[in-house]
Design a protein with these regions (language model features):
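YjeF_N-associated NAD(P)HX repair module
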Residues: 2-5, 17, 110-217
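An N-terminal, well-structured beta->alpha segment
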Residues: 1-48, 216-217
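Electropositive phosphate-/nucleotide-binding environments in soluble metabolic enzymes
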Residues: 4-7, 21, 25-33, 55, ...
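Nucleotide and nucleotide-moiety/phosphate-recognizing core
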Residues: 36-115, 123-145
Length: 217
């Protein structure tokens, strides 16, 4: 049984887990592993990143793809990183994973949307809206990390990336399933990274955390 919670509850649960002794980079690794396991990876893969922890999840995914001999490209929209995201980005650079700041999806088969997380509120800035429009018009398959970039995690409102699949991290958020998210998420998958969350229950298929914890790439 899945839990359906607010963004604030997820954030507090995440903070409590870290305060209790779980390494935040371990949680980020688990999230990236959930992404890796949730898709049939093939063709040209672009991992489009912003500045937050969603980007860090994408960097872990890039490392796992590289580890399994699957080429990918990181498309950075900013040079800023969260502390944990920066750690995994340096690992990507050390391994020679392709990195670009050019937004061109004309030959892309799969786009991984790691731009904005569940904390986003309000309207997209013009530059970010343009990137979202380019993703939506690309014709590529799209996987969104935790929430579709631009979507309000509590209400489902907002101009946002349209995904073929969204992989929620930890627990489902209200915004994933409210009516305003209709037409924006084609399929929804939740990956449990081992954070206890308080909330109402909803039946939905979920991944698990049964994989090894070794993220020393």
């Amino acid at each position: 049984m899945e839990k359906l919670i607010s963004v604030a509850v997820m954030r507090a649960s995440d903070a409590a887990e870290i305060a209790g002794g779980t390494d935040s980079k371990t949680l980020m690794y688990r999230a990236g592993l959930g992404l890796f396991q949730s898709w049939n990876w093939h063709g040209r893969i672009d991992i489009v990143t912003g500045s937050g922890n969603n980007a860090g999840d994408g960097y872990v995914l890039a490392l796992l793809l590289h580890q399994h001999g699957i080429p990918c490209r990181i498309v950075r929209t900013t040079e800023k990183n969260s502390p944990d995201g920066g750690y995994f980005f340096l690992k990507c650079e050390e391994r020679g994973i392709s990195v670009t700041d050019s937004i061109d999806f004309s030959h892309t088969d799969i786009i991984v949307d790691c731009l904005l997380g569940t904390g986003f509120r309000g309207e997209l800035r013009p530059a970010m809206r343009q990137i979202v429009e380019q993703i939506n018009q690309s014709g590529a398959s799209v996987l969104s990390v935790d929430i579709n970039s631009g979507m309000n995690g509590d209400s489902g409102e907002g101009f946002c990336v349209r995904s073929d699949r969204t992989v929620s991290i930890g627990c489902l958020k209200y915004g994933h399933l409210l009516g305003m998210a209709q037409g924006k998420i084609d399929s929804l998958y939740n990956y449990d990274i081992g954070i206890p969350c308080k909330g109402s229950y909803l039946p939905l298929f979920s991944g698990d955390t049964g994989a090894p914890e070794n993220w020393d790439f």
